[in-house]
Amino acid sequence: TLSLHDALPIYPGQKRDYDSDYGGFTCCNGTGMENHVKYQAAAYAKTDDTLYVNLYMPTTVTWDEMGVSVKQETNFPSEHSKLTVNGSGDFTMKLRVPYWATAGFEVKVNGETICTNPEVSTYVEIDRAWSDGDVVEITMPYTLHLDKTPDKVDGSTVASLMYGPLVMVAKDDRETYVPMNWYTVVLSENLEDSVEVVTGPDAEDGSVPHLVTNGLHFYPMYDAYNYRYHAYVKVEETQSVVNKDQLQSLVDSAADALQENYGEDKIGRAHV
């Protein structure tokens, strides 16, 4: 039998436990099992002459009308996926470009690059006469972004730190919202400049992704177990974020103006 549980906890400093070692989930026992069937149903779609690849997961789809099958190989949370065509036929393959794949998305067919950096939330279209053994390789580097809630908490913006498709949670015992102030970390408009990627999604030793910023260590939500975590953090936005290159240009201009009046030996040039 399966025991019931209230929900997956996301309050500050919560800890996820399983109902039992082998007979329960962290929450949603019914829909938890249903998820996997839904993934299968949503992974691919087709029309008379087009195959849509919607999800990047280890699967094999058989297209009886076209007389082909496509095997997809990937190792979540890897940034890479490979599709191998079995059989031959003239059809279009459309590959989904995730909304978070904002840099470095690349598609190769039989080792030849056919597309780089397409528009996000669209499909890359490959229309060709496919042969048995054709290989499509997809690379989609994970990018960092904040997923903000519609409302604020005590006047502060609340958000989840996302790494590609992964919700990253901060490992921290505090039971109040932990703050992150990007301005105090680095004068930049890019999260990549203020978040250190300790372990990426393709770690050779199989380690899960690991990010560090503001002294906080972030791990994927799916791996958070038996410790207190924060799925949402307060993002301090009280000061304007300034582009580092723009700020350096302003400092250099001011230093040049001062040197004209006071001389090179009197002025020290600042660096940001």
Regions found by a protein language model. Give the residues of each.
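Conserved small/polar residues in nucleotide/adenosyl-binding loops
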Residues: 2-10, 270-272
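C-terminal beta-rich recognition modules with glycine/proline-rich loops and embedded aromatic residues
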Residues: 7-84, 119, 128, 139-249
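Solvent-exposed beta-strand/loop surfaces of large extracellular or lumenal domains
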Residues: 102-127, 146-152
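Mature, Sec-exported extracytoplasmic domains of Gram-positive
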Residues: 95, 239-269
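Surface-exposed beta-strand/loop patches in extracellular or lumenal glycoproteins
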Residues: 84, 89-99
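Extracellular interaction modules
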Residues: 1-6, 130-135
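Hydrophobic, well-ordered secondary-structure elements that form the walls
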Residues: 95, 136-138
